[in-house]
Regions:
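N-terminal amphipathic/basic leader segments beginning at the initiator methionine
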Residues: 1-59
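Acidic/glycine-enriched edge-of-secondary-structure segments
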Residues: 40-66, 88-95, 320-340
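Glycine-rich phosphate/diphosphate-binding loops that line cofactor/substrate pockets in enzymes
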Residues: 67-88, 115-118, 340
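Short loop/turn segments at strand-loop or loop-helix junctions that form parts
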Residues: 81, 85-90, 194, 262-263
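Short internal beta-strands
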Residues: 117-129, 260
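Conserved, well-structured core segments that form the ligand-binding/active-site neighborhood
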Residues: 148-339
């Protein structure tokens, strides 16, 4: 098969030939332009799936039509103790433009809780052993209204090293402990608000990893699990996923968890940086001009300034699906959408 024919086998796969344009490649805080050897295979992301026109409506529908359990409103009673856990700043990357999807989910959930007389509500960031989010980051993620009402007493980071704030809920068949955030574990209802960007996000991993302690984490976040995983992004071939599933089943047996999972598209850039999503062979004169302008500007800035400039560009992710209910049926549907 000729190179000219091979390069057209899929819209996201290109084989470099004599007529191919130079390729843009990230290099630290820079972008370089290089002519690649003939025959090099270049992979591009699929075009972004169109976002849902009304994400608020999609979230409300999911809450009222859950998988494997009663609707959220039917599980609420006045005076009950509810904890809402949310993904930390590691999802998504780069950070999304505001309002964050977590803010939208929280606004809808908190209004529903208030409407059913549920006043004992805490919001916990499921940061596991990641660094704790800063006050500014926490405010940006949930918006001023929620932040001002709940921070700092009822909106805070999970602390995996605070012994009094942890409780053991079980152990695996290998006697590996599962120790979780005490507030979450002792609540009448734990609601988890999740964002799925890649297949290793969400599902059983959300609670079992996001709200655990070091001893629980060390059983699967270690070199042997990495060696035993063909790919973190293929759950069926991931030892990490298998271990998280075993822990997650303990969570589901011991706690009442209501998952809200969302899938987002891959629309990382728009406007002056949208050319970075394109095949260089399809660049217009304006695209090339934007790249040269960006490269020239970057070359004149010190490294810290380049880094700050790149990180100041929020991603333009859009929600493409939302499902709610029990862990596995919800995650199966979200993963299927993410793989599209």
């Amino acid at each position: 098969m000729s190179l000219q024919l091979r390069r057209k086998t899929h819209e996201s796969v290109v084989y470099i030939d004599r007529d191919s344009a130079p390729r843009i490649m990230p290099s630290g805080e820079d972008f370089i332009l290089e002519d690649l050897p003939i025959g090099t295979r270049v992979l591009y992301p699929n075009p972004p799936i169109k976002g849902l026109p009304n994400r608020e409506a999609a979230i409300r529908y999911a809450l009222n039509h859950p998988h494997g359990c009663d609707p959220l409103f039917a599980q609420l009673e006045p005076g009950m103790r509810v904890t809402v856990a949310v993904d930390d700043i590691s999802l998504p990357l780069p950070p999304m433009a505001t309002p964050d999807i977590r803010q939208t989910m929280l606004e809808i959930v908190l209004d529903m809780l208030a409407g059913h007389g549920v006043d004992d509500v805490h919001i916990i960031i499921a940061n596991s052993l990641h660094r704790k989010m800063t006050e500014w980051e926490m405010k940006r993620m949930v918006g001023s209204r929620i932040f001002n009402e709940y921070y700092p007493d009822r909106y805070y980071n999970h602390d995996a090293e605070w012994t009094e704030g942890l409780i053991k809920i079980g152990e695996t068949r290998h006697k590996e402990p599962l120790v979780l955030n005490r507030r979450a574990a002792e609540s009448d209802l734990l609601i988890y608000c999740n964002i799925n960007l890649v297949p290793m996000d969400g599902g059983h991993k959300s609670v079992a990893v996001g709200l655990c302690d070091y001893e629980s984490l060390r059983a699967h976040h270690e070199p042997q699990t990495i060696r035993d995983s063909d790919s973190y992004m293929d759950p069926a071939r991931s030892a990490l996923n298998h271990k998280c599933t075993e822990l997650g089943k303990i969570v589901d047996n011991e706690l009442n968890v209501f998952h809200i999972e969302t899938a987002i598209n891959n629309r990382m850039y728009k406007g002056d940086m949208d050319f970075l999503l394109k095949n260089e062979d399809d660049f217009t004169a304006f695209d090339r001009m934007k790249f040269e302008a960006m490269r020239y500007t970057m070359s004149k800035l010190p490294r810290p300034a380049r880094r700050k400039l790149l990180h100041s560009k929020p991603a333009q992710y859009e929600m493409i699906a939302c499902h709610a209910g029990k862990t596995e049926p919800v995650h199966e549907r979200i993963i299927a959408k993410a793989f599209e």
